[in-house]
Amino acid sequence: MIRSIKGDLNSLNIKYKDNNFIFIPSILLLIIGFTVHYFFGFEAAIIVELPLITFILIALLFHVYRSVEKDLEEERTQTQAIQSIYTFITPRYPLPSMSRWTAYPDLAETIVRECMTNKPKLVVELGSGISTLITAYALEQHGENDAHIISLDHSQEYTQKTQDLLTVHELETKAQVLYSPLEPTQVGNKTYSWYNIDRLTTKDTIDLLIIDGPPVKTNQLARYPALPLLFSKLSKECIIILDDAARPSEQQAVRQWLREFPGFKQEYISNKKGLSILRRTR
């Protein structure tokens, strides 16, 4: 029953932002109603409040309609991205679901397209998961024989989960997941909580860098250290994909990267969580 109620609320798109939209007008209505009733009586309060209530209800319906319309458009976009992924790769087994706490389909589709177009030999990913699996498939089916992905994850649990997922899909030779706990790391004159990259000992340069970690709550500008710390390992044609680029902290990180490493230009994709793609300028 509880699940059913939650589903009905979700279908009406009642969210935190909607509660904010409803709360302030409701308080104003109460204040106006009590004020008019106090000075002019009940009938006057009804005459004043009815048009206001009607207006607010119409505005609320329009607000919910626009919000639902936006969500439906986003669902269509994600569905199209999933269809594209299944067009580009042929999984041996069904792919896990892609949602809020995993890579969204539009991120996965972007990664697959970059793998197909640029055929990277080495992909390094910060934060493992379904994107690791899909990238491994893309490298196996569209890349060079020795193309592979190395994924760093600060969580031992998710490191194992991703490795198990790769084993089920028979992709162990195309992907490696390294447990890399976060530790104090000096970048410039600031200390960040960032991956221990001592195990990233590959001699190959990085052709595609996917930044989907560490979590934003670990520290301010949590993902900024990626470029300063890995810049020397990037190939001359390296492409960088930053997920969650709609966040102010990620936008600030990109601005600092472009200022400190002027050899890159940014392409911003305004999707569910925002994507920034940095390419070297020639």
Go through the PLM ranges and name each one.
Residues 2-27:
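Juxtamembrane interface helix immediately N-terminal to a transmembrane segment
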Residues 37-53:
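Hydrophobic alpha-helical transmembrane segments
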Residues 53-175:
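Internal alpha/beta domain cores that form substrate/cofactor-binding pockets in large enzymes
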Residues 120, 205-207, 237:
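Local beta-strand N-terminus motif with an aromatic residue
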Residues 142-144, 202-203, 230-236:
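Short, conserved loop/helix-junction motifs that constitute active-site signature segments
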Residues 163-204:
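S-adenosyl-L-methionine
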Residues 203-213:
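Short SAM/SAH-binding signature in class I
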Residues 215-282:
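C-terminal substrate-binding/active-site "lid" region of AdoMet-derived donor-dependent transferases
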